[in-house]
């Protein structure tokens, strides 16, 4: 049987009183007091001890009540009621400090739970959006494939157009799966080794796959180095992905025949390199510029399949930048264009 604190204290006090009274009674007898005096002293001792017990109970009772309140609060917390956070918990110092520590723990757990719920909601919306985005290219691929198989599409120009659409939708699927792969790996703590980067060579390797598209869309793309930049150490893999996503974004949200500029500058005092990708696209209104890197946000403020992709490119780029010693900033004017600037901090591999 587990005794309550009240019972243990009372038993302790009563035992102490009985022991003290017994010892005093024996002492009175040994002192050769007469019977009347011995009885008087013994009764006085017992009465005094009872008063002590009463006073002790008066002081102990509020403490017991506070402990009961604290026990109720911990049970509520254990049952998922994280809002039961009594800030006006008056009690002795030790119990007060215990309550403050509990409140702090409850507050932190509540914040973590809210964050988990928010992230779970975002993930649910993300999966729903991606599932919807996957249906469109899949339906298109199935439709045109069946048309080619069943002989419905027979004219040469229609066949060529169908193949072009199939390739386009297959590329779109590839982009969607690529985005999903990066979303999954973003929060796994994966690290990349620093590599020596020659920036002009890196840009050539990034821009080469876009050569045919730029020619086909009659675009102008210029790369400008403000000064000669020596090779430096950075995380190559995430940097390639960041620049690719920003370039994709510039191409998606600007018109065919428009201009794309990539300007590179170096700040030797801060040991940083800025890579600015500018387009002549639709632009972003100021109140939305802070939100464009959110996981569930798209510039059009709707899931417009016209631009293709999942709308996750900027989110992925920003997350990779934050995780790999870089930063992305944005400046934009409506119907003028947008500039995305990646600020790279050179890595000191000797430290």
Curated annotation (Swiss-Prot):
| CDD domains xrefs | HATPase, HisKA
* Transmembrane spans: 9-29, 40-60
Which Enzyme Commission numbers does its entry carry? 2.7.13.3
As one GO molecular function, the record gives: ATP binding
- Please report the PTM annotation for this entry: Autophosphorylated.
Extent of the signal sequence = none
Domain Histidine kinase, which positions?
Answer: 129-348
Using the record's annotations, give every residue carrying the modification Phosphohistidine.
132
What this protein is called in its record is Histidine protein kinase SaeS
